[in-house]
Amino acid sequence: MNRLKSDQKTKLRQFVQWTQVTEAVSLNFLAKANWNIEYAMTLYFDNPNLFAGSTPQPSVDRSNIERLFNQYVDPKDKVGEKRMGPHGINRLLTDLGYEATDRRVLVLAWKFTAQTQCEFSLDEWVKGMTALQADTVQNLRQRIDSINSGLESDKAKFHELYLFAFNYAKSAACRNLDLETAICCWDVLFGQRSTIMTQWIDFLWAQENAAASRLAQNVGASNAKQFKSVWISRDTWNLFWDFILLSKPDLSDYDDEGAWPVLIDQFVDYCRENLNYPKPGNASNDQQMETPSYY
């Protein structure tokens, strides 16, 4: 340890404190993560026995986990026996210091494999807390903060969270995700909007408003408000990840013959016709747009 730099010693102490494993095991994880402590923590919680000879996960007290769960069960929620509902989860988020629109809230639901928005079953809670090796609110926050930070350097894990968000966010009675909820999820997942993300969302609202206007002519404006015209299918949601991740900022490499969802095809056409994006075979090297931070 004497050969380590000052900042490495600090990271080593933090890793040992958070995971309760030995210094030797901690050094292995930190070295594999090139001393990126967030990525090292993600590696550890995904596979604590990654290195031969590593110690098993420190045990957590199930009774403490259940006791903590019961502190957040609120009779006002009326979500059934042994379930934490919206009131309880709001108190939990307050204790964690998270806003409802914080991506860490979605990470929490993902790590607990939650099936219903704003609810945790006792089973989800116990399995999630045990997997995270947390039995206090403080430990839970440390684990979730670390996993969330690690997403920036672990695209595969970020993709898992992205795919989880579709099922978690949509209504159980619907196959697709309504537009407003989808946009909210994209904002939570990706944060500040890039140019292409802003244009995508503007396009979707334009599609929704145009469809609503046509509908209003047939059924009246008041009746038209009851209907949603643009829905995000699972296929569109899943492939939008590839689209936003792989496409050049000016979409000059977009494959018109590729198996893209219709909505994405329409968006590319919209950009070419209305936003001066280069058309196929006429790509421009001069168009300047920022690359999203989540690339």
From Swiss-Prot:
Protein name (Swiss-Prot/TrEMBL): Defective in cullin neddylation protein 1
Main location per the UniProt record: nucleus
Organism encoding this protein: Caenorhabditis elegans
Key words, A-Z: Nucleus, Ubl conjugation pathway
One GO cellular component, as annotated: cytoplasm
Keyword flag Transmembrane: no
Function statement: Required for neddylation of cullin components of SCF-type E3 ubiquitin ligase complexes. Neddylation of cullins play an essential role in the regulation of SCF-type complexes activity. Does not act by preventing deneddylation, but rather facilitates neddylation, possibly by acting with rbx-1 to recruit the Nedd8-charged E2 enzyme to the cullin component of SCF-type complexes.
UniProt-listed GO biological process terms: astral microtubule organization; establishment of mitotic spindle localization; protein catabolic process; protein neddylation
SUPFAM superfamilies: UBA-like
Domain of life: Eukaryota
InterPro entries linked: DCN-prot, DCN1-like_PONY, PONY_dom, UBA-like_sf
